[in-house]
Amino acid sequence: MLSLKKSMLLLFFLGMVSFSLANKRSDGKRADEEGEDKRADEEGEDKRADEEGEDKRKRFLPFLIPALTSLISSLG
């Protein structure tokens, strides 16, 4: 059976892999949107990308912070 330390590290790395895959998927969607939306100016695209980045951080940080704190406390 996995120890708590190993299971927390495994959970952390699985989370990072899923986050990486989600970023790749959103990059592909963004490329499709840019192909359809060629008339949009650069400022509008930058603003949309910034908003998408903020949304990703808002979804990921609540998961990451408790996982990291529990990982640190289990290692210490």
UniProtKB/Swiss-Prot annotation:
Belongs to the frog skin active peptide (FSAP) family. Brevinin subfamily. It comes from Kassina senegalensis. Keywords: Amidation, Amphibian defense peptide, Antibiotic, Antimicrobial, Cleavage on pair of basic residues, Fungicide, Secreted, Signal. It comes from the Eukaryota. Residues 23-55 form a propeptide. One of its GO terms (biological process) is killing of cells of another organism. Expressed by the skin glands. This is Senegalin. The keyword Protease does not apply. Residues 1-22 form the signal peptide.
